[in-house]
A protein has these predicted regions:
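Long, charge-dense, solvent-exposed interaction surfaces that engage phosphate-rich ligands
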Residues: 195
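ASCE P-loop NTPase motor core, strongest for the SF2 helicase catalytic module
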Residues: 1-190, 199-224, 228
Length: 228
């Protein structure tokens, strides 16, 4: 891993030790997947997956990518796909990979598992807090929750609230309280004091690095072709 990726992995691991989830929101191409895989491998090495499992929820287009990346970077992890019309739950796998569509339909199935971690990739898929998909993902029980997104806010700050509420339920309060306390002052009034407060209270479990960051630029290869 590159140095900034090691920092991201260590940050997520420290959060996990404290019982905190994480939102890793690095720019696309900076290796969010690799950082999370390193974390899952650490869980395996520490015996945390001896009796529990990890569920990774991804867009359908990323199923095979996740499987191949896990095989390449963490061959010690047992990996199973749960997808397709004849899907069968891989009870012996350390890591189960499924799609948002399956997760939405089978909350009961996943809540019968003992999940140590629930990871969602492209977490902007739950930006609409009232959508059935968002409610389903938030109702899957796990000791630890990790969200990955290169675009945690696409339009409104309430999208951010929805993802943070997945990682740490109720931490930012109810949606209406969040709107009056943060969204309106920041988006409508451009209140810098409120923005500073918001950044401080979310900083412990949100990490975002950009390709334009000086320290990142120095550590990047000449060409980035994939998100790892």
């Amino acid at each position: 891993m590159r140095s900034y990726q090691q920092v991201g992995y260590a940050w997520m691991y420290k959060n996990a030790q404290l019982g905190l989830g994480s939102l890793i929101a690095d720019d696309m191409g900076l290796g969010k997947t690799l950082q999370v895989i390193a974390l899952l491998l650490k869980f395996k090495e520490e015996g945390l997956l001896d009796q529990q499992q990890v569920l990774v929820v991804v867009p359908t287009s990323l199923l095979t990518n996740w499987k191949s990346e896990l095989a390449k970077f963490a061959p010690l992890l047992g990996v199973g796909l749960y997808h397709g019309p004849r899907r069968k739950l891989p009870h012996e796998a350390d890591v189960i990979i499924t799609t948002y569509g399956v997760a939405r339909m089978e909350v009961h199935t996943f809540n019968q598992l003992d999940l140590y971690a629930l990871v969602i990739d492209e977490a902007q898929a739950i930006k609409n807090s009232s959508a059935a998909q968002t409610e389903a993902l938030k109702s899957i029980q796990a000791t630890l929750k990790i969200a990955m997104s290169g675009t945690p806010v696409e339009n409104r700050l309430t999208e951010y609230w929805s993802i943070v509420d997945f990682v740490h339920p109720s931490y930012l309060g109810a949606m209406e309280d969040f709107k009056s306390r943060y969204s309106v002052p920041i988006e409508r009034d451009n209140d810098q004091m409120v923005l500073d407060t918001f950044r401080k209270i979310t900083a412990p479990f949100i990490l975002r690095r950009l390709k334009s960051d000086g320290s990142i630029i120095q550590d990047l290869p000449d060409k980035i072709e994939r998100d790892w």
